[in-house]
């Protein structure tokens, strides 16, 4: 422990706790504070509580965080940090622990002396968790004692009291989310596990243990998972890229501080063609990028360009190919993780996940520029491999432009015209319209007849959709099935510069783009192919909240005069339990299994899958970009075994047809 840390440890007391506002507002308008009141908001409570412990870890005082999902769906988070101060708060005249737990925005993270940087996107602190819980209990291990206070809906039940002695330090929080506020109070293990894994990678050396005490249907308990990454981002980039083939061996890594900004980067080049950069600020995934990402891209391109200009062999290759290398070319087949720590981050953008601090751009440029120049000089073999891939990317980019232009020449209408197979809607206001991408001609026929022509368009997809995970950029524009989708929805490329790979959605023709496929394994594979196309080539559509998946029913259950469509095996069982159980005349039960969309007549398809009043739509979102990247590369990659395991685990219908 450094002298500075020792002084901080001794001085972390009530005077470091800053107070900003009260809790009533949180219960009145919870979505303002945690994003929403559905599954996402529910899991945000865990993140907000764990962030307190991560702040202790980033300050150098905590090495182990234990997260437990209890049998009653409450959550316990315990760390071995210094423990929240319990002495009296000067202004509030009550225990600092009570202030932290009951006043919004109160905490060490708002006092620069306690934490130089602090995690948490909303930064509302653990008091917000308290306000949105029916019950919460805080225990602090500090000064040789165990201090405790309990709360109901954010209000203390008694003053902070000593309930025992201890020789350890740290904080333990347990909370029960309020079912009158959240639409669900059931925690999903996988969502919590993904975030804990991410935090362990972003904070090298810390150990996070995740335990689920809820037994499964057979009464078995899941084994606790321990997340620990000694090498941090180096392990993270390997994890994200584990289904791809690296062309440079070990990741290129840097960990430094420039202009007061701690910067960490790990990157790999692989044999694929997509660019996957995941950026973080204070452990927050900046999905929309920002100044740290801009600085990284500029420095990387500059270093590689300088190297290829100064190397005779590479320079001759570029001259022979008659190409001009563009910035995008330097990032084809690149996977990178960038993590910066910023004392006062300014977030911008649609989802407040874009870093706006201008000083970070220069700091990252310096750090990455120096590290890349050194690496390229010391690793000439790898440097040549990367630069040769860049030259190939530039060649493919020019081929893509030609392919795109030839498609647009064939269709002289604006934007390349509309495909002949598109059955468009009569309404021309995009915000009121939606398009269904439907698997196969027969289902497309039913969908065309069953739709509301005023606002619903249908594009039948014939033949196999191209797996874009494994192809060069220009091949996408040569595939008719892909171009039909791009032209139908109104996405344009080359708007921000003729060779730009950014998809422009300013002239998107529909507010909702709905993938509609059969409820079987083949259907889920087609879903995945289309989602991969959007994720890799048109992520702006997903980020704008425009991509959805339709959920056709698996069964129609009829018993006497009762009839219901069932979308899951559980719903079918619930129907049987409700109407048939105990009835000796069970022969009256009729179950129709829909294997494909084409088996439904147009009225049934409208009633179950297309009518906005009844249908079940799943919105495609990218909550965790690094996790999504790893999943898509696994699903669409060459290795069959992990793909089969994933589909069997995640497609509830996979075992029905097996």
Summary of predicted features, one role per range:
Residues 89-90, 97:
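Short adenine-binding "F-helix/F-box" segment of the Bergerat
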Residues 395-414, 429-434, 445, 449-451, ...:
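C-terminal interaction appendages of subunits in large macromolecular complexes
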Residues 90, 348-361, 565-571, 575-579:
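Helical (often loop-to-helix) elements that flank the catalytic cores of nucleotide-handling enzymes
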Residues 28-46:
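Conserved short strand/loop->alpha-helix "switch" segment adjacent to the catalytic nucleotide/phosphoryl-transfer site
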Residues 1-16, 23, 47, 55-57, ...:
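GHKL-family ATPase ATP-binding module
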Residues 83-88:
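A short glycine-centered beta->alpha linker in the GHKL/HATPase_c
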């Amino acid at each position: 422990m450094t002298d500075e840390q020792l002084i901080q440890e001794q001085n972390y007391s009530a005077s470091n706790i800053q107070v900003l506002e009260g809790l009533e507002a949180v219960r009145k308008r919870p979505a303002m504070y945690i994003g929403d009141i559905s599954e996402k908001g529910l899991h945000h409570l865990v993140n907000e509580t764990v962030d307190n412990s991560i702040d202790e870890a980033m300050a150098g005082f905590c090495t182990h965080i234990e997260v437990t999902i209890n049998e009653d769906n409450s959550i316990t988070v315990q760390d071995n940090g210094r423990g929240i101060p319990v002495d009296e708060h000067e202004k509030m005249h009550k225990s600092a622990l009570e202030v932290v737990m009951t006043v919004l925005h109160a905490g060490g993270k708002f006092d620069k002396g306690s934490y130089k940087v602090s995690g948490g996107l909303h930064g509302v602190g653990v008091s917000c968790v308290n306000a949105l819980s029916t019950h919460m209990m805080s225990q602090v291990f500090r000064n040789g004692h165990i201090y405790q206070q309990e709360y109901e809906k954010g209000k203390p039940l008694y003053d902070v009291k000593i309930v025992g002695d201890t020789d350890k330090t740290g904080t333990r929080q347990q909370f029960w989310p309020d079912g009158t506020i959240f639409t669900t109070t059931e925690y999903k293990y996988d969502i919590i596990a993904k975030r804990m894994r991410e935090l362990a990678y972003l904070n090298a050396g810390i150990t996070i243990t995740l335990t689920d005490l809820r037994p499964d249907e057979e009464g078995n308990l899941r084994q606790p998972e321990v997340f620990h990454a000694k090498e941090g981002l180096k392990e993270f980039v390997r994890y994200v890229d584990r289904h791809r083939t690296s062309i440079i061996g070990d990741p290129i890594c840097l960990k430094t501080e420039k202009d007061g900004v701690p910067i960490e980067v790990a990157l790999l080049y692989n044999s694929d063609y997509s660019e996957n950069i995941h950026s973080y600020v204070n452990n927050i995934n900046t999905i929309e990028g920002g100044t740290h990402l801009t600085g990284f891209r500029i420095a990387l391109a500059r270093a590689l360009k300088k190297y290829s200009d100064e190397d005779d062999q590479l320079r001759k290759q570029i001259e022979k190919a008659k190409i001009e290398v563009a910035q995008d070319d330097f990032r084809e087949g690149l996977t990178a993780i960038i993590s910066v720590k910023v004392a006062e981050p300014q977030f911008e953008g649609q989802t407040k996940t874009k870093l706006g601090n201008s000083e970070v751009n220069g700091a990252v440029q310096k750090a990455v520029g120096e590290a890349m120049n050194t690496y390229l000089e010391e690793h000439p073999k790898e440097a040549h491999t990367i630069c040769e891939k860049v030259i190939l990317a530039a060649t493919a980019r020019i081929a893509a432009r030609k392919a795109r232009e030839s498609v647009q020449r064939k269709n002289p209408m604006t934007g390349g015209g509309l495909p002949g197979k598109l059955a468009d809607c009569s309404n021309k206001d995009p915000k009121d319209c939606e398009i269904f991408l439907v698997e196969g001609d027969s289902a497309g026929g039913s969908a065309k007849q069953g739709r509301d022509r005023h606002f619903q368009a249908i594009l039948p997809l014939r033949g196999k959709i191209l797996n874009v995970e494994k192809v060069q950029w220009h091949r996408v524009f040569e595939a008719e099935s892909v171009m039909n989708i791009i032209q139908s929805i109104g996405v344009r490329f080359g708007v921000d510069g003729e060779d730009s790979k950014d998809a422009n959605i300013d002239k998107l023709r529909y507010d909702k783009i709905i993938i509609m496929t059969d409820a079987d394994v083949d259907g889920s594979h087609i879903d995945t192919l289309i989602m991969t196309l959007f994720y890799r080539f048109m992520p702006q559509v997903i980020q704008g909240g425009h991509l959805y998946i339709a959920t056709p029913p698996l069964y129609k259950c009829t018993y006497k005069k009762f009839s219901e469509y069932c979308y899951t095996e559980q719903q079918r069982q619930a129907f049987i339990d409700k109407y048939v159980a105990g009835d000796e005349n069970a022969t009256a039960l009729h179950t129709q299994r829909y294997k494909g969309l084409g088996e439904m007549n147009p009225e049934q398809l409208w009633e179950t899958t297309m009518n906005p009043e009844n249908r079940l739509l799943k919105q495609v979102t990218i909550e965790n970009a690094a996790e999504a990247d790893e999943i898509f590369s696994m699903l669409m990659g060459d290795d069959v075994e992990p793909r089969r395991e994933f589909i069997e685990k995640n497609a509830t219908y996979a075992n029905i047809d097996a």
